[in-house]
């Protein structure tokens, strides 16, 4: 799986899956790209593309959808190696998402 994140200033950060024998510690391509960009000071994004050798367009996992929502990435482009493409919003991928507005300030 590969991902590319377009920042508001036009810079692009790429990501790949980082596998681990303990599957829970594996990091997906989408989050790798997002975390690389954030670690370099970017917090505003235009779009994220994700592609894999899958039957249909590669859909992000739930954890990636949550992170995309946290960073307000408006456009998600999902594809595969055959050229199938779906373009959706993060909101469409994660309706009724949990966000910082759901955290009660104590």
Name each model feature, range by range:
Residues 14-102:
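Zn2+-dependent cytidine deaminase-like catalytic core
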Residues 1, 102-103:
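Unusually extended, aromatic-enriched hydrophobic runs near protein termini
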Residues 1-7:
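Short beta-strand scaffold segments in enzyme catalytic cores
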Residues 106:
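Phosphate/diphosphate-binding glycine-rich loops and adjacent basic-rich segments that engage nucleotide
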